[in-house]
């Protein structure tokens, strides 16, 4: 099968993928994020996967208590949700299936990566985001958990989040792509832990060859790679 086969509408859909809708919106102050999974599926996301050569099974939606108010209450609700997400992702990967999680704000990545890490030896993470999401409960001005996902899976931050990740991701197996808006505390963490990062400025100055080099370096260290992308 050549790469052109993915562009053929009649290509056989043989690659199984589990699509996990997660209607999480309490990790950020951005309205509408909780509605994204249902919206994408309504517009034909599953059908688009079939055209690309995947046999998609849409799993039951992970429902979130998006109406809770207050930082502490939201943190508790998020912690409970990402534990559920962790178990689903771990179970699907353990069955040999690929998982595509649809959010929702990026706080859900704590659960998806936690599950993938438990089911995979030496996992690598590619984090595609304009923001580092490397704040902690102590360094965050807003208290929004969507800005703490990366730090949590690496083992930094509030125990209510880090405890969800039973198998922490190694900092050497983590790659940022697309950074352009960071807090100083996040910059300090990335520097102190020597986490690989390709910023938007790097891409503008050096182009995609630099990006390809960093991805290849990650592939040499990690057996499997999980991609977490915030749009």
Segment roles from a protein language model:
Residues 2-231:
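Conserved alpha-helical scaffold segments that buttress catalytic/binding sites
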């Amino acid at each position: 099968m050549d790469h052109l086969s993915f562009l053929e509408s009649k290509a056989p859909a043989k690659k199984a993928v589990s699509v996990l809708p997660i209607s999480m919106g309490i990790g950020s102050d951005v309205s509408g994020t909780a509605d994204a999974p249902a919206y994408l599926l309504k517009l034909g996301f599953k059908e688009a996967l079939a055209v690309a050569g995947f046999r998609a099974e849409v799993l039951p939606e992970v429902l979130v208590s998006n109406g809770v108010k207050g930082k502490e209450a939201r943190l508790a609700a998020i912690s409970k949700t990402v534990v559920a997400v962790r178990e689903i992702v771990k179970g699907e990967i353990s069955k040999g299936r690929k998982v595509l999680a649809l959010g929702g704000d990026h706080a859900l990545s704590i659960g998806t990566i936690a599950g993938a890490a438990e089911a995979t030896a030496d996992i690598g993470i590619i984090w595609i985001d304009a923001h580092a999401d490397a704040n902690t409960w102590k360094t965050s001005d807003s208290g929004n958990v969507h800005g703490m996902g990366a730090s949590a899976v690496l083992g930094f931050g509030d125990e209510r989040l880090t405890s969800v990740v039973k198998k922490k991701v190694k900092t050497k197996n983590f790659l940022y792509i697309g950074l352009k808006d960071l807090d100083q505390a996040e910059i300090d963490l990335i520097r102190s832990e020597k986490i690989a990062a390709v910023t938007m400025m790097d891409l503008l100055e050096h182009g995609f060859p630099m990006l390809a080099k960093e991805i290849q370096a990650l592939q040499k260290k990690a057996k499997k790679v999980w991609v977490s992308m915030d749009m």
